[in-house]
Amino acid sequence: MAKKSSVEKNNHRKELVKRFAEKRKALLAIANDESREMEERFEARLKLAELPRNSSATRIRNRCEMTGRPRAYYRKLGISRVALRELGNRGLIPGLVKSSW
């Protein structure tokens, strides 16, 4: 089980990303638009730098919904390999069978 503070920190980052998504997208569009003047693009970059660091999507860590584990994360299911194995052994994931050969 991951520390509650780590999970909460990540949840706070997700919230910030949602809150600043539109503003960040608009500023990036201005900054990357080569048809605009260099000064205008530079100002957009400065405004982008003033946004909170945690409002960037790259700072979000994929974590298991059940345990908060940050590694061995299956995106399709939203859980870690450990949680996947536990649920699979209990028969709670349809179509998942233990392999044997």
Swiss-Prot record:
Pfam family, one: Ribosomal_S14
Keyword Ribosomal protein: yes
Cellular component GO terms, alphabetical: cytoplasm; small ribosomal subunit
Keyword rRNA-binding: yes
Domain of life the protein comes from: Bacteria
Alphabetically ordered keywords of this record: Ribonucleoprotein, Ribosomal protein, RNA-binding, rRNA-binding
GO MF terms held by the record: rRNA binding; structural constituent of ribosome
HAMAP family xref list: Ribosomal_uS14_1
Subunit annotation: Part of the 30S ribosomal subunit. Contacts proteins S3 and S10.
Family named by the database record: Belongs to the universal ribosomal protein uS14 family.
PANTHER family per record: 30S RIBOSOMAL PROTEIN S14 (PTHR19836), SMALL RIBOSOMAL SUBUNIT PROTEIN US14M (PTHR19836:SF19)
Function of the protein: Binds 16S rRNA, required for the assembly of 30S particles and may also be responsible for determining the conformation of the 16S rRNA at the A site.
Protein name: Small ribosomal subunit protein uS14
Source species: Methylorubrum populi (strain ATCC BAA-705 / NCIMB 13946 / BJ001) (Methylobacterium populi)
